[in-house]
Amino acid sequence: MESPEDRNGNDVRQPLLEKIPVKKEAEGEERLCIDEMLQRYCGEFGRWQLKHFVLTCIAWALEAFHTMVMIFADQEPEWRCVGSDCRVGSLNCELDPSSWEWTAGKGSSTVSEWGLICGDKYKVGLVQALFFAGCMIGAGVFGHLSDSKLGRKGSLTVVCIINAIFGIATAFSPNYWTYVVLRFLTGFSTGGVGLTAFVLATEPIGPSKRGVAGMSTFYFFSAGIAVLSGIAYVFRSWRELFIVSSLPSLLFLLIVIPFISESPRWYLVRGKVDEAMKLMHSIAKTNGRHIPAGVTLALDDDVENNNGERNTAVEGSLKDVILSPLMRMRLVISVAISFTVSIVYYGLSLNVGNLKTNLYLNVFVNAVSEMPAFAITAVLLDKYGRKPLSIGTQWFSCVFCLVGFSVWGAGPWKSVRMVSGVLGIFGMAGTYNLLFIYIAELFPTVVRNAALGCATQAAQMGAILAPFVVVLGEELPFGVFAVCGLVGGGLAFYLPETLNKPLYDTMFGMHEAESESNRERGEVIC
């Protein structure tokens, strides 16, 4: 077999794609992998992909609703004195319950309704921790199910059903512990929303457009937070807020899901070649393109070895990833980076949220401020690659967190710490979102969502720990965040670059391609 250098004149931007097309002369059939068919016949990002991408990514806004609603529902409202024994400046824990009252009434938040203050204040943090614990479990479960029998679309449908049911049910919680259970169950389904929607939205997109498209998915999450702040401003009762923020999941099921297609890659690895080809023809037709007769799809390892058409499903699991030295190292590093990045991202977000400002305006501004990070990262992603950008954004955040840790005292130094926090989260927001693209490209289709699920679980563990880092004070958390950024950036050195590489379908196909690429370039990578 000819090497890519012989055929392409040393074009290192496409080291694997040109060797994939194989014509079976006896049958007059040309068998291509999905990336090659998108590039040659269907279009990498046309009208079909744009519509599918936008509809699928609406799910990210739903995830923002179910996750960030706790900021408003669990807030501690303002209170006022109503008796002569109440003194301005006192803590309400020190006062007789009859001498003060909640300004907005007892039903404005869970804190005011169930008295989650003083000795019971820890219960607010407990709800948050258990929600993210549910996310961690759900990410693993739905990551596996979306790679296996349910598929990407099936998993997205299931998690939206669960979100709608338990999200609305939460509004009718009769007591605190029922509320805790329902938030945990909502977290379980929410953990599967983002990773399933991300893979479903990006898998039908060609390799040269996939990076920018992948980064663009996170605009929907930030937009969801911004919209939620407006909804919370209008609906001040926590029960009303849960109903209004959960109804969009029901509308998504009824209006949007029917117009979303399953991933052609999932069809292919499950042995459903006819369904995959039908979808590819639909993509080509909508994009104003045409797939010639005699052209069909094949898995990358079938194409590589010129095998016949496969009609059986190709299975993959985390066990296969762990047993493979190549995949195992990638998974361990991906999990570690996701954990450290999440601590910094959520930790800095909570630090900014602790500012004594208008809560609704503050949440809105924080959501909007992340968008420039997404835009800049998207522009640089295909110019400099995933690996350098992952290292650079984490170390950018590390530098400003180190500045925040180094300056002590009040006065102007508080402003320096605030600016350091904003710039720190600016860098880490780019990393946090870049990781979805990077990790998705590091693993083949048969285990892609399972690997993303593991990384998401690690990120949720970081989210659980972040509040405990924040309570260390004003300066010490910056030191922890700086160390996390430094370590995460260092670990990224051990990952391979995936820019302009195809998305592989099977473990065998990825192993063969990576081994040949290493031999040709004389490199050893994870």
Swiss-Prot record:
ATP binds at A201, T202, E203, P204, I205, G206, P207, S208. Gene3D superfamilies: MFS general substrate transporter like domains. It is found in: Vacuole membrane. InterPro entries: MFS_dom (IPR020846), MFS_sugar_transport-like (IPR005828), MFS_trans_sf (IPR036259), Sugar_transporter_CS (IPR005829). Mostly expressed in siliques, and, to a lower extent, in stems, leaves, flowers and siliques. Present in pollen. In the stems of secondary inflorescences present in the phloem cells and xylem parenchyma cells. Residues 74-123, 175-179, 236-240, 353-360, 412-418, 473-475 are extracellular. The chain crosses the membrane at residues 53-73, 124-144, 154-174, 180-200, 215-235, 241-261, 332-352, 361-381, 391-411, 419-439, 452-472, 476-496. GO terms for biological process: cellular response to water deprivation; monoatomic ion transport. Induction: During drought stress treatment. It comes from the Eukaryota. Residues 1-52, 145-153, 201-214, 262-331, 382-390, 440-451, 497-526 are cytoplasmic. Pfam families: Sugar_tr. Keywords: ATP-binding, Ion transport, Membrane, Nucleotide-binding, Transmembrane, Transmembrane helix, Transport, Vacuole. One of its GO terms (molecular function) is transmembrane transporter activity. The keyword Cell wall biogenesis/degradation does not apply. It is a multi-pass membrane protein. Coiled coil: none annotated. Its main location: membrane. High affinity carnitine transporter involved in the active cellular uptake of carnitine. Also transports organic cations. PANTHER family: SOLUTE CARRIER FAMILY 22 MEMBER. Belongs to the major facilitator (TC 2.A.1) superfamily. Organic cation transporter (TC 2.A.1.19) family. This is Organic cation/carnitine transporter 4. It comes from Arabidopsis thaliana (Mouse-ear cress).
